[in-house]
Design a protein with these regions (language model features):
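C-terminal outer-membrane/trafficking sorting elements
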Residues: 22, 765-808
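Aromatic/acidic polysaccharide-binding cleft in carbohydrate-active enzymes
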Residues: 48-49, 583-681
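Short carbohydrate-recognition loop motifs
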Residues: 83-100, 111, 155-159, 259-280
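Secretory/extracellular carbohydrate-interaction modules
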Residues: 96-160
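Short, aromatic/His-centered strand-loop micro-motif at the edge of beta-sheets
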Residues: 162-182, 328
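Flexible glycan-contacting loops in extracellular carbohydrate-active proteins
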Residues: 204-226
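Noncatalytic carbohydrate-binding groove/subsite architecture in carbohydrate-active enzymes
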Residues: 353-357, 361-364, 469, 492-604, ...
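Carbohydrate-binding surface patches
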Residues: 675-712, 718, 755-759
Length: 808
């Protein structure tokens, strides 16, 4: 066959001084189609971890809407984070399976802290934290050094927190896992000397990025712990507790009497306010950060009330109540629960404002289910717009939140404000005001394909009732469970999952035969006998097997390609005719920086090369509040505060890929390259070629592109995202790392930055025809790209693929 070639030279741009580079090339045959690429690989995964939903996407400005949080416990001199701390007989305790810290509100540059500690239930890693700065809610949301004991391993642990976890030392030492131990640290700036039960066991000096002063605190991660006999510089500090009678996300206003009532309109609690005019409660939104009040925005609300007071007053105020922006009185309160609505138009803006509910006459009221929202309810407008601009094609609502016992579909339908709250995995006092139906509605609103996950113990009829409510949004994908048996390889656990999958599948499939099902049994490449059992049991029922790789760096993403190939190989070995494929519903990591962006870009190349075996891909997590970090999941793509939204490098990597999607993978071959990964894709009409290049090296490689069977090049566009591996965007510099788009003169050298994801879009003015064919192609029949025989080839453009003639 005669071939016509169009050649373009590509070179790379260095970050900093240029380095000598050997000749490197990529050869692309635009006519040799290697596979098809699903349009649904540009996804994102969301669940209510880090308050992505409640406090984030959900346009409910009140946090603690139903007063489910226990009453606030004040411990003199300390400020608590995450969980509730309590004091009994001088012993301070935290009862949790998650994490919490208690920070003493005095700054020290040097000193000595000593405490006796008893490790409790669960798997606690507990102890002291020093040089604490910038503390907030979230497991790693602070700066400081940690000195701790690990109950499970019997190890001493020393590490640094910088809104993340940086392990420094972890070694076995002698202490009791069932009795009191004495932990002490002597510190001078970033120098620390650590003692366990009076024995010096470790010294550390941080000279790289030292923290020279800060507060100290007590912390437990992964389980419960108790503390007593605290000494600061040898002087006892007593744990003294007072209770205000107010649910933990609210503050008292005035001098009223407050009681958290153990019943409510919904849920298990409500809030009583008793006193005179002006006595009330104040809410500051998520994490007490403040509610954004915009004078150009109308605010609407609902509150359920009962009581003896004739009327109450609702208001938008400054954080401390010194300024008021809008107010409205509510009357007609009776002894039975009744919903009251209100509208507030603020006279001024305040990015850290508050909402107040107070008595406007003597008596008492009991309040429950307080809603404050804007016209965009139930979706926060600025976050919605950021989602829309990312050009996602797929959204998954699922994750560990699904595994919570109370995560049940029966509580997710009906009027939002009347739904029952539930005990969540990531946040104990979770709301169903935003649940799976709202997420499906949201996905359709921004033009993406939704998938949701359900609890494997859910009732089939309840799930069907929820799906019925979702019918206007045409949900097509349903996952049963999430990461099932992640913590056990036991065969009976997998058998139970298979049993529950079938129960739910059979009921749902009968009513929704076109629904696609995803199963969530945890894939274990080292337990193939069990994997084969699951495969045979669910083959023909489950359309996809959910796979969650760890992809924090490009190097880790590179290794995943073999995992995908091995998975596909096993599927075909177990059943050559299987239609089950792989869905990557979570690419996971602990970061949201440039390294994570390049890792995702590399993963997309892996997925493209899978030739449709992986038609769905969604990195976690879709969004995250600034300085909110639960359990290390510091991996949001969209970041937000109460008043602003900005995007991280992985967001832009996904946006670049989605904007330049083409459906056909064409042959590409790299020569003499390291730390660079490339795929080439093409439009169906053959007029657009897209190159996705991931350069995860710190130096450049000069690329020469050898392009065959493509028309005359009309234009070239380059999109490039680059920066240091740890580069991320902040509220102060929200666009520090964003894609740069340039038009490149045809025929000139193109430049690929070091440590970058770069997309080249090459357009042709026409498509090369194949008027002469050699004996290599004896068949005169022609086909379309889907493999269908075409009889009329008049005015057709012929291409060659796998020794057969195809036309466009």
């Amino acid at each position: 066959m005669n071939k016509l070639f169009s050649r373009i030279a590509l070179s790379a741009l260095l970050l900093g001084a240029p380095a000598a580079a050997s000749a490197q090339s990529i050869s692309i045959d635009a006519a040799n189609i290697k596979g098809t690429i699903s349009p649904l690989i540009y996804g994102a995964g969301a669940e209510d971890v880090n308050h992505e939903i409640y406090g984030g996407l959900y346009d409910q400005r009140i946090f603690g809407e139903g007063f489910e949080e226990p009453e606030a416990i004040n411990i003199e001199g300390f400020l608590p984070y995450d969980e509730v701390w309590s004091v009994k007989n001088g012993v301070l305790s935290i009862n949790t399976s998650n994490h919490g810290k208690l920070v003493y509100q005095t700054d020290y540059a040097k000193g000595s802290i000593e405490v006796e500690m008893l490790l409790g239930g669960g798997s606690p890693i507990a102890g002291l934290i020093i040089d604490v700065q910038e503390a907030g809610n979230g497991a790693d949301n602070f700066r400081g050094y940690e000195i701790a004991l690990n109950k499970n391993t019997g190890h001493f642990v020393f590490g640094k927190h910088d809104h993340n976890w940086q392990p420094v030392q972890d070694f076995a030492t002698t202490f009791s896992v069932s009795a009191w131990n004495t932990l002490r640290v002597d510190f001078d700036g970033a120098k620390a000397t650590c003692f366990v039960n009076g024995v010096q066991i470790y010294k550390n000096s941080d000279t790289a990025t030292p923290l020279l002063h800060g507060m100290f605190g007590l912390r437990s991660y992964g389980g419960s712990a108790s503390f007593r006999n605290l000494k600061v510089n040898g002087q006892p500090v007593a744990f003294k507790q007072t209770a205000a009678g107010i649910s933990g996300m609210w503050y008292g206003v005035g001098n009223g009497k407050y009681t958290r009532v153990n019943s409510g309109f919904t849920g298990k609690a409500s809030q009583m306010i008793q006193g005179t005019t002006g006595d009330g409660i104040r809410n500051l939104g998520l994490n007490h950060w403040g509610i954004n009040i915009d004078k150009d925005e109308a605010y609407h609300g609902t509150v359920y009330l009962r009581g003896t007071a004739d009327k109450v007053r609702v208001a938008l105020q400054s954080k401390d109540g010194s300024r008021e922006y809008a107010a409205q009185e509510i009357d007609g309160i009776k002894s039975a629960w009744k919903a009251f609505t209100f509208d507030l138009q603020p006279a001024a803006s305040d990015s850290i404002g508050s909402f107040v509910l107070e008595l406007a006459s003597d008596g008492y009221v009991v309040a429950d289910q307080v809603l404050l929202c804007t016209d965009s309810y139930p979706f926060r407008k600025d976050i919605t717009e950021s989602f829309r601009q990312q050009k996602l094609t797929f959204l998954r609502y699922g994750g560990t939140m699904v595994n919570a016992e109370e995560y049940m579909s029966k509580d997710m339908i009906g009027p939002r404000i009347e739904r029952q709250p539930y005990k969540g995995h990531w946040y104990t006092y979770s709301t169903n005001g935003f649940a799976a139906p709202e997420f499906v509605e949201f996905a359709r609103l921004i033009g993406t394909e939704p998938a949701i996950a359900i609890n494997i113990e859910d009732n089939p009829q309840d799930v069907l009732a929820m799906l019925k409510e979702m019918e206007p949004y045409n949900l097509q994908m349903l996952e049963i469970g999430n990461e099932e048996n992640l913590f056990t390889a036991a065969r009976p656990a997998y058998e139970h999952y298979v049993e529950r999958f079938k129960v739910l599948y059979d009921a749902i499939h009968r009513v929704y035969p076109d629904m696609q099902f995803i199963h969530a049994a945890w894939w274990r490449a080292d337990e193939l006998e069990t994997m084969e059992y699951v495969f045979h049991e669910l083959d023909g029922k489950a359309d996809f097997w959910d796979f969650h790789p760890w992809t924090e760096t490009p190097q880790q993403a590179k290794d995943v390609e073999n995992d995908i190939k091995n998975m596909q190989s096993k599927f075909l070995q177990w059943n050559p005719d299987t239609k089950m494929r792989c869905a990557i519903f979570e690419e996971n990591g602990n970061t949201h920086d440039m390294a994570r962006a390049l890792a995702h870009a590399y993963m997309l190349n892996n997925v493209r090369r899978s030739n449709g075996f992986v038609p769905l891909d969604s990195p976690a997590n879709a969004l995250q509040p600034y300085q909110q970090n639960d359990n290390g999941w510091d991996q949001g793509q969209i970041f937000f505060s109460p008043s602003s939204v900005w995007n991280q490098p992985p967001y832009y990597a996904q946006q670049m890929a989605a904007e330049t999607h083409q459906p056909l993978l064409v042959e590409s071959e790299l020569s003499r390259m390291s730390n660079i990964d490339v795929t080439a894709t093409r439009s169906e009409d053959g007029k657009t070629l897209v190159i996705h290049a991931v350069n995860y090296g710190t130096t450049t490689g000069n690329l020469t592109l050898n392009l065959s069977n493509f028309g005359e090049v009309k234009s070239i566009k380059r999109l490039s995202l680059s920066g240091p591996a740890n580069g991320e965007n902040t509220p102060m510099q929200p666009r520090l790392y964003v894609p740069v788009e340039v038009d490149v003169e045809v025929g000139s050298k193109l430049r690929l930055n070091a440590y970058s994801y770069t997309v080249f879009v090459i357009s042709a003015s026409d498509v090369l025809g194949m008027e002469k064919h050699t004996a290599d192609y004896p068949d005169d029949k022609c086909y379309d790209l889907a493999g269908r025989l075409i009889n009329d080839t008049t005015n057709a453009t012929i291409i060659i693929q796998n020794r057969r003639k195809f036309l466009k």
